Amino acid sequence: MPEGPEVQRSADRLDEALAGRTIRAFDARTKVAKAWLADHPGAFVGKRVERVWAHGKHLVGQVEGDLFFHSHYLMWGKWHVVAPDDEAVRTRDRRERARILTDDAAALLYSAPKFTVGRGDPYAEIPALPRLGPDVLAEPFDADAFLDRLGEQPDRTVGAALLDQTVAAGIGNYLRAEILYACRMDPWRLVSEMDADERDCLAREVPHLSQRAYEHGGRTVPEAVQERQAEDRDLRYSPHAHAWNTRHWVFRRTNLPCVTCDDYVRQKHQLTREWTDDESGETVEKKRIIYFCPTCQGVDPQYVTAARPHKDRRPPDSEWADPEQDPEADDA
C-alpha cells in the first residue's frame, strides 16, 4: 500500500498539473462519485482547481465553488498525469476510476476503489479525515499530538499502534518497520511499557524517516548505506531479486544480514487489530507482517524464528505474496 510519502508525491504532481487550471471534463466510475455527479451534472466543468494536498494516505483536491474530490489508494491505486491528447485519455483503460481534464493536462486515477466528490469542507464531508492523527510529513510535525494519541492506547503493542491512522497519518508497513528499527524497539512492546527515551525517539524518527522516504522515492536508508547494500553481495538477495532489499534497514530484507550487527533480519505476522464480527459474534483478527532485527531491537525470543539464509539469497515467497487482504482495517 502506498504510504504517506508516496501519496504526498502524487498530490504534488497533481497540484503542479492542475492547480490554477480550469476543468474541461470530469468523470468518475466509483459508485458514490458517479451517483453524486449524476445528481449534480456538470458541477466541476468550467471550475478552477485551487489546490491538491494530502493528509496521510488521503489525497484531496479543492475546486472553485466549494467543491472537492478525494481519493484513497488502498493497495493498488495510483494517479497518473499525462498530456490531454495522450493515448490513455483516448482509449480509457478498464482500470480507470476517475479522470480530470484541463487544457494542459489529464489526471487519471487507476485501480483505487475509493474516489468521492462533493461540496463543502472535506473535513466535514469525508468521515475519515477528522479522525486522522497528525500528518507524518507536516512541517512542523505535531509530536505532542502524536504522543498523546499513542498514549491513549496503552494496551496495544507499539507495532500495532503505529499502523493506526488516528495516531499518525501516513505510516504503513514499511515505515513502521523502519521507524521501530531506528529506535531499536521491540515491535511487541506495549505502549504503556515505553520509556521517555523511546517516546522521544518515535517523535523524532516518525517525521525524519517519512521525510527521507518522501525526498528519495521511498528510500529510508542514507545513500551510503544503500551503496553498501548494493555492492556487498552478502547484504542483498541475488541480482534478479526486487530492489527493495537495498532501500531499507529491515523492510523486506528477511534472512539477510542486518547492516548494523551480525544477526539476520526476520519477519513474523503480528496481531495489529481485532474486533467482534456483528453477525457471528466471533473475534476477528487482523495481522500484518513485521520485519525486524532481533539483536538490534532486543526482540523477545518468543517472537524470533530461526534464520534461514538461502544459498542464492532469494526472498521468501511470503514477501511477494503478502497475505494482507484487509487494507482498510488499520490503514483507513
Regions found by a protein language model. Give the residues of each.
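Gly/Gly-Pro- and Ser/Thr-rich, intrinsically disordered tail segments characteristic of DNA damage-repair
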Residues: M1-G118, D300, R313-R314, E319-A332
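Basic, nucleic-acid-binding surfaces and adjacent catalytic neighborhoods in DNA/RNA-processing proteins
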Residues: T22-D39, W53, G151-A332
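Phosphate/anion-contacting hairpin/loop surfaces
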Residues: F69-R184, L190, D197, L202
